[in-house]
């Protein structure tokens, strides 16, 4: 029996080989006890403030919205140590690993940001780190590969399948199946078998808590909409979490890639089917035979054929709205923010920004406050941009 509800509505669960069930139960037990442990919480928030650099700013884009009645704010997770929101939850998971007396960390990565964050946490806590990464992603994110190796991580190239994030996830799970007694699998997003979606949300929820406090200080009211890009969904659930019970539009932006009609996209929430993948029940991209269909996005961090179960649930009850943005639209938003505000966003975050700009342009006379989560800084983005 689990200590926490493993489902979000019909989504979630623990669809893993029986051999991994004790490891998941152990993880859940230690997570629940850590949440009640004042010393654990004190150390976690100390690290967030004094090592990671929280709180992150909420920046008003004055030039971007000139001539309209829209205000667009950016939640600057790109300024966090490591360059992404990923650092938040890996610090928490590393502390859980130590609590469980695990000395080795297994991780998967797509864009490389979770790999970098995992390497950061392992260096800080003196843990052995091995990171699985698709060969395709290694080629387009070699700067992050260098950063991981510099901090002592072993980067394992995955050549199976499409050589992207889904294949790295599969290999990481295989590794954990044979090494779980001494290793902790540090999943990088709010997906996977229970209790990972809950753990990641709880270790990311300070994004939403800070955002609410900051916008109330600046505007004395809540925003009209919160907008975040969706791959697995950790940055989005982090910023959504504190607004779920408020009258605020929650908008998740999936990658439409070359266009939904082409089939070259990564939008399982609105254009996929319910199925079992990566240890969970959620929406995923499938072909007519029910096999996993390859996803596509110019952004490696969004190139994932499924999505976290809490997002699937929020979609099913119509609490959050999920839309899609093409590669071309994301590139345009990337250019506009860079030139208008001097802030260079990652391609992941450019999807969220692109939808915010769409809302602004729809009717410039409407007074509205929009917050886009700028979840990642991408030092490799220039090569991707030039190749596009």
Curated annotation (Swiss-Prot):
Xref: SUPFAM superfamilies: Tryptophan synthase beta subunit-like PLP-dependent enzymes
Domain of life from the UniProt record: Bacteria
Reaction catalysed by this enzyme: (1S,2R)-1-C-(indol-3-yl)glycerol 3-phosphate + L-serine = D-glyceraldehyde 3-phosphate + L-tryptophan + H2O
Top-level enzyme category: lyase
PROSITE patterns: TRP_SYNTHASE_BETA
Record text on subunit structure and interactions: Tetramer of two alpha and two beta chains.
Protein name: Tryptophan synthase beta chain
The organism of origin for this protein: Buchnera aphidicola subsp. Acyrthosiphon pisum (strain APS) (Acyrthosiphon pisum symbiotic bacterium)
Record gene name: trpB
């Amino acid at each position: 029996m689990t200590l926490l509800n493993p489902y979000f509505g019909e989504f979630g669960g623990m669809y893993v080989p029986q051999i991994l069930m004790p490891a998941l139960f152990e993880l859940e037990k230690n997570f629940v006890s850590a949440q009640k442990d004042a010393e654990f919480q004190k150390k976690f928030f100390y690290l967030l403030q004094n090592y990671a650099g929280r709180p992150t700013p909420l920046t008003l884009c004055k030039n971007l919205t000139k001539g309209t009645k829209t205000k667009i704010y950016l939640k600057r997770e790109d300024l966090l140590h490591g360059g992404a929101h990923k650092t938040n939850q890996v610090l928490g998971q590393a502390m859980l690993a130590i609590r469980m007396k695990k000395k080795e960390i297994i991780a998967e990565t797509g864009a490389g940001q979770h790999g970098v964050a995992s390497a950061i946490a392992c260096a800080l806590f003196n843990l052995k780190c091995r990171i699985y990464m698709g060969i395709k992603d290694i080629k387009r994110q070699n700067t992050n590969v260098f950063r991981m190796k510099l901090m002592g991580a072993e980067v394992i190239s995955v050549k199976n399948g499409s050589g992207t994030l889904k294949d790295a996830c599969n290999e990481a799970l295989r590794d954990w199946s044979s090494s779980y007694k001494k290793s902790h699998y540090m999943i990088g997003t709010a997906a996977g078998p229970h209790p990972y979606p809950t753990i990641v949300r709880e270790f990311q929820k300070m994004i939403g808590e800070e955002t609410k406090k900051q916008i109330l200080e600046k505007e004395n009211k809540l925003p009209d909409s919160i907008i975040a890009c969706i791959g697995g969904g950790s940055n989005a659930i982090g910023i959504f979490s504190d607004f779920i019970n408020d009258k605020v539009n929650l908008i998740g932006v999936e990658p439409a890639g070359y266009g939904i009609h082409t089939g070259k996209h990564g939008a399982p929430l609105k254009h996929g089917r319910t199925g079992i993948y990566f240890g969970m029940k959620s929406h995923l991209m499938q072909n007519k035979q029910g096999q996993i269909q390859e996803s596509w996005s110019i952004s490696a961090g969004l190139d994932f054929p499924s999505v976290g179960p809490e997002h699937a649930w929020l979609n099913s009850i119509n609490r959050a709205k999920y839309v899609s943005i093409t590669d071309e639209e994301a590139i345009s938003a990337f250019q506009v923010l860079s030139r208008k505000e001097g802030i260079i966003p990652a391609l992941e975050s450019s999807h969220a920004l692109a939808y915010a700009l769409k809302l602004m342009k729809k009717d410039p006379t409407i007074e509205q406050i929009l917050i886009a989560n700028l979840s990642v800084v991408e030092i490799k983005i220039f090569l991707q941009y030039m190749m596009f």
